[in-house]
Amino acid sequence: MKERLVIFDTTLRDGEQSPGASMTMEEKVRIARQLERMGVDVIEAGFPAASKGDFEAVKAVAEAVSNSTVCGLSRAIEADINRAGEALQANQNMRIHTFIATSPIHMKNKLRMSPDRVIEQAIKAVKWARQYTDNVEFSPEDAGRSEIDFLCRILEAVIDAGARTLNIPDTVGYTMPDQFGGLIRTLRERIPNSDKAVFSVHCHNDLGLAVANSLSAVMNGARQVECTINGLGERAGNAALEEVVMAVRTRQDYFPCDTRIDTTQIVSTSKLVSGITGFPVQPNKAIVGANAFAHESGIHQDGVLKHRETYEIMRAEDVGWGANKLLLGKHSGRNAFRSRLKELGIELESEEKLNTIFIRFKDLADKKHEIFDEDLHALVSDEAQIPEEHYRLLSLVAHSETGEIPFAQVVIATGNNEQQAESEGSGPVDATFRAIEKILNSKAELQLFSVNNITSGTDALGEVTVRLQKVGRIVNGHGADTDIIAASAKAYLNACNKLHSSLERTHPQV
């Protein structure tokens, strides 16, 4: 029987550090439940000491998840570890993940600590975490640029202190696959007590090598991979969970281990995360991109028709791609609606939330002849973007005529008040945004405006993503409607609501 490769998902922690990808507590719980449904072994829910909001989100995930291990990140200081322990106590399999920097540049310039002092601090942190759980993970931050002799010393010491998982991060995505795999092999060979711990890796994608480095590490003895859905994460992102899992599954002739992931849930999970964060999946993205199983070349099409394995190394249905079939219509009832949401891996928090989305579904069905699974994902994501709206669109009139200056008029609810404004612009969307700004005066900088059609057809639901920046804070707004101008207004207001309710966070780089 093959060894098990532990899949450690950090979408809720490291993935959230993608600029604009902040999530509400309810959104984190929805994603965590889907990760559990997919069979993820460990869910890193966040950094409890970062803020009250992060603490409450980790606590909510720990309470919502029972089969997967829920993990909280903490620096190697007692106060952080205490917050993690408190937030995670509802999860029977809780894990505390503590870290400290070990590269010369970090120890000298950031920590301003000697190597011996760093080892002492790491030992103390692991022992302190063991008061809460035996399931303790330790990471030497920036291991890729750390001296090998020092790494061996500190890892041997934390194993003796009780750490059962050793995570080796390539924090800045600097190493090459052979180099990183060799590092894992060397550590396992040189550390006397290495057999008492599981070696894990956490690779960043700055050079586009996160998945390659992770797989190289697996071939050299790593038995846990830290990854994110769609490769979300700081800067260029992390190793993509779907790529790691399917590489190991597809090449069982090559890898000495396997995962317990239900791969048929991959596409649904990808769409859920994309919808909540507002980060669309690129069409040519491996496994979950819209073109991942498309063949346009005549030669390729002919080969696939004759024998699928000529050009397909895995089946689309194995990762959750199915026929884009007609699903529901305006005569469909609430039970059928609920049943299909459940089949798509979507579980809503309450009957009230179901009723709200069902009403929106009925409105969409009146406008759109065919309702597809993608439409349902968009409706749920649009509704769940933010729990309390400080700004709400009440009405919108946009006018665009050839040879005339586009014009928009909006009415927005701000708290208990209603305000109206109108503006001209270079186009109907620009005019709408300018009218909104006359009311909100957010002074935010528009960094991104993106429109995606959810399904085919001129009556397709349009999905708009807006990215705003204000005083260093970056947020993504999301809106969906058959009217692109209305979807744009919703997305802009959604982003402004996030700016209004944003919380300051500390983002550790592991």
UniProtKB/Swiss-Prot annotation:
Ranges for domain Pyruvate carboxyltransferase: 5-267
Cofactor(s) the protein requires to work: Mn(2+)
EC number of the protein: 2.3.3.13
KW DNA-binding (keyword) present: no
Pathway(s) where this gene product acts: Amino-acid biosynthesis; L-leucine biosynthesis; L-leucine from 3-methyl-2-oxobutanoate: step 1/4
Catalytic activity: 3-methyl-2-oxobutanoate + acetyl-CoA + H2O = (2S)-2-isopropylmalate + CoA + H(+)
InterPro entries the UniProt entry points to: 2-IPM_HCS-like, 2-isopropylmalate_synth_dimer, AIPM/Hcit_synth_CS, Aldolase_TIM, LeuA/HCS_post-cat, LeuA_allosteric_dom_sf, LeuA_bact_synth, PYR_CT
Annotated spans, Regulatory domain: 392-510
Annotated PROSITE patterns: AIPM_HOMOCIT_SYNTH_1, AIPM_HOMOCIT_SYNTH_2, PYR_CT
Swiss-Prot/TrEMBL GO biological process terms: L-leucine biosynthetic process
GO molecular function: 2-isopropylmalate synthase activity; acetyl-CoA C-acetyltransferase activity; manganese ion binding
Enzyme class: transferase
CDD domains: DRE_TIM_IPMS (cd07940)
GO cellular component: cytosol
Subcellular location: Cytoplasm
UniProt entry tagged with the keyword Calcium: no
Similarity section: Belongs to the alpha-IPM synthase/homocitrate synthase family. LeuA type 1 subfamily.
Oligomeric and partner information: Homodimer.
Function: Catalyzes the condensation of the acetyl group of acetyl-CoA with 3-methyl-2-oxobutanoate (2-ketoisovalerate) to form 3-carboxy-3-hydroxy-4-methylpentanoate (2-isopropylmalate).
Name recorded for this polypeptide: 2-isopropylmalate synthase
